[in-house]
């Protein structure tokens, strides 16, 4: 005989599935910069770069999992949108750094 499927059993199954998905392809969480010391621009930029690379790798891993049929479309879209946002931020920072460098070069001594 078939057992009656309750909404509680379905919810528990969905929660377990989501937990597994989250653990499998979770983007790298931003790590806190250690306080108490002298925090320089270089250490902040290094941390931001590391976080962006982790996000891009998570998006790539989600795409590969989707091609293998292991990942839902919704999760892949979320990971890729997060990766796209990280890439756009990196490009914007690069553009600002180049612009600042060009301004310094143009300064008269």
UniProtKB/Swiss-Prot annotation:
This protein's record includes keyword Kinase: no
Signal peptide span: none
Molecular function (Gene Ontology), one example: structural molecule activity
Keywords in alphabetical order: Bacterial flagellum
Organism encoding this protein: Bradyrhizobium diazoefficiens (strain JCM 10833 / BCRC 13528 / IAM 13628 / NBRC 14792 / USDA 110)
Stated name of the protein: Flagellar hook-basal body complex protein FliE 2
GO cellular component, one term: bacterial-type flagellum basal body
Compartments, as annotated in UniProt: Bacterial flagellum basal body
GO BP, sorted A to Z: bacterial-type flagellum assembly; bacterial-type flagellum-dependent cell motility
Disulfide-bond pairs as recorded: none
Entry-linked InterPro entries: FliE
Transmembrane segments: none
Annotated Pfam families: FliE (PF02049)
Coiled coil: none
Protein family membership: Belongs to the FliE family.
């Amino acid at each position: 005989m078939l057992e009656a499927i309750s909404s509680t059993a379905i919810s528990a199954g969905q929660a377990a599935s989501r937990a597994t998905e989250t653990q499998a392809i979770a983007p790298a969480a931003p790590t806190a910069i250690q306080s108490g010391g002298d925090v320089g621009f270089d250490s902040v930029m290094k941390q931001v770069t590391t976080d962006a690379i982790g996000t891009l790798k998570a998006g790539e891993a989600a795409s590969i999992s989707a091609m293998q049929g292991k990942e839902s479309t919704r999760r892949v879209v979320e990971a890729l949108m997060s990766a796209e946002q990280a890439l756009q931020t990196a490009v914007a920072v690069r553009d600002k750094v180049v612009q600042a460098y060009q301004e310094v070069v143009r300064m008269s001594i």
